[in-house]
Amino acid sequence: MAQVEKRGGLLRKSSASKKPLKEKVVLMYDEIFMTEDPSKCSPRFWEELFLMKVNLEYLEGKLESLDGEELMKIKDNINCLFQHCIQALGEEHPIRVVNALQTLCALIRGVHQKNKSTSGFDIINMLMGFDKAELCMKNLMESLDSLLCAEGSESLKSLCLKLLLCLVTVTDNISQNTILEYVMINSIFEAILQILSHPPSRREHGYDAVVLLALLVNYRKYESVNPYIVKLSIVDDEATLNGMGLVITQALSEYNRQYKDKEEEHQSGFFSALTNMVGSMFIADAHEKLSVQTNEAILLALYEAVHLNRNFITVLAQSHPEMGLVTAPASPTPTTPATPLGTTPPSSDVISSVELSLDADVQTSNLLITFLKYSSIVMQDTKDEHRLHSGKLCLIILTCIAEDQYANAFLHDDNMNFRVNLHRMPMRHRKKAADKNLPCRPLVCAVLDLMVEFIVTHMMKEFPMDLYLRCVQVVHKLLCYQKKCRVRLHYTWRELWSALINLLKFLMSNETVLLAKHNIFTLALMIVNLFNMFITYGDTFLPTPSSYDELYYEIIRMHQSFDNLYSMVLRLSTNAGQWKEAASKVTHALVNIRAIINHFNPKIESYAAVNHISQLSEEQVLEVVRANYDTLTLKLQDGLDQYERYSEQHKEAAFFKELVRSISTNVRRNLAFHTLSQEALLKEFSTIS
């Protein structure tokens, strides 16, 4: 037994002697994790530390391996390391600055990771010490601001932004991240704007800058005055707003391109041939294979810009060559982390006005068109939670746009016509529309097409009621503008009317299932009131008198659906159930639709009998309608052109808190600090002796 122990001892000694030597930086980290001040024995300790290549994994792992008590014992050394990192940011040698930035990232992440399981110490105290926190963070933010605004290294700017993203997203709920109080006090808003307004910086760092801004805007936005919200709402510099728009356009365009590539690859493959052979039984499965990860972070940035800054609305309509049709000039690919599809922008800014001029042969586009295409992809499939959130946010953004007077002006402008190829969900009963046959029309037509497309493709068991309500509200707000400004839009209104009637039919045929989960009468009332808008005010905004005739024809043709709806709501409004009041509102709203049906149906039957015709053509019905308008009596209904304006704080706060939490987690997961190798940095900073 003693011999075995001896052998074991010898073996241990032998294996220990073969153990690789620790790199010097790791030995220095180990000294920091002792209770003694490492600079006592080595006065140049901190100076030397920042010349060493950072070992992020070791530093973070070491912090996570200690329990709360052990960490508190070395608190002074951690504070000292944090302060020396901040001091190193002011050094002339860029290598020191880079190492200090990376060390700060490791420190912040390591201490926060520790805090998840041990809440017995405060993070600010652990990193900086309560007494020095204010000055430390002031110095840190000032250094980061200087580095971001300087004309120096793009690699340093990239690391500064990554450190800030690390700082912001280190907790899932950013509003619980107390360190951000110092980021509010020591604002870097102007530095972010400078990046966005300066084309070279925007090309390299625009995406990170926009995501950072979107997250900072959401810090305790409902509890206190957030300076980033205040400042973003008053930005009026054209170059800055356009820069932000370009970054968002690029990111959404990249998503659209990836989706289109996947779609084409899928259609040309074996599975497509198999689908054609056996019919459409695989359509749903095939469609799900086309899923590309959504980009909620950039969508949130677009929402905040549209919602907070009225000047940004002009950026939506800024024309530029369509990104998919333009070849970007050759340029080195910036060092960005490998992230999932749809989460990173293209590598170069292909729409700088300096680099590209508009060509008459090239299809022009703008941010709104890119966004509508993005929405048409995301809103196809709402079964997945991320896509459901993205679809909801798309509709919220469209709601804000539909309420804005200036946005409506360019949406309805006859002189701003575009061909917008929206993505349509594969369905058995319809063929894929040929993109080339699409006419150039005002942009509001594409918005209405998108709403109609959503209405007809989501009548399913898992009914997305919230999205339907928002969709119908967008249509209503657009109609209110058309009525108010007497805009006669040349649109195929019949498609909208047909979609709305089919939606009513769906609600009625699934009454029992839907009523168990939803108040279907709110949606039914909104649909009926859309028809009331057309009936009451259609003569002021429908393109031609014949369009108004077609409205009546459609109501008369589908009278059975309206009769069934009336029977259903009458039944529920006369019972003493929970739906009594909601159903009675629909009953009252149907008064004019029922008046039209009851007025014209006998006249049509009489016309058919007199002329011995068993089935009247559309033109014959329209002839009867035109001849009998004079004797029709309708009731004037109030408030049809009124609506409640969008309000985030009261109705959407829970949604945005959850969305920002999801974005924060995703950004943190995809943050990479190893994108810059030490060799690449040494090459860039070749001035170092």
Swiss-Prot record:
Segments spanning the bilayer are: 520-538
Gene encoding the protein: Armh3
GO CC field? cytosol; Golgi membrane
Q: What is this protein called?
A: Armadillo-like helical domain-containing protein 3
Family per similarity comment:
Belongs to the ARMH3 family.
- Matches recorded under PANTHER family: ARMADILLO-LIKE HELICAL DOMAIN-CONTAINING PROTEIN 3
Superkingdom as given in the UniProt entry: Eukaryota
Q: Which GO terms describe its biological process?
A: regulation of Golgi organization
Q: What are the alphabetically sorted keywords of the record?
A: Cytoplasm, Golgi apparatus, Membrane, Transmembrane, Transmembrane helix
For this UniProt entry, what is the primary localization, expressed as one broad class?
A: Golgi
Summarizing the function annotation, the protein's role is: Involved in GBF1 recruitment, Golgi maintenance and protein secretion.
Under InterPro entries, the record lists: ARM-type_fold, ARMD3-like, ARMH3_C
Q: Where in the cell is it found?
A: Golgi apparatus membrane; Cytoplasm
- Membrane topology, record value: Single-pass type I membrane protein
Q: Does the keyword Metal-binding apply?
A: no
Describe its partners and assembly state.
Answer: Interacts with PI4KB. Interacts with GBF1.
Q: List the disulfide bonds.
A: none
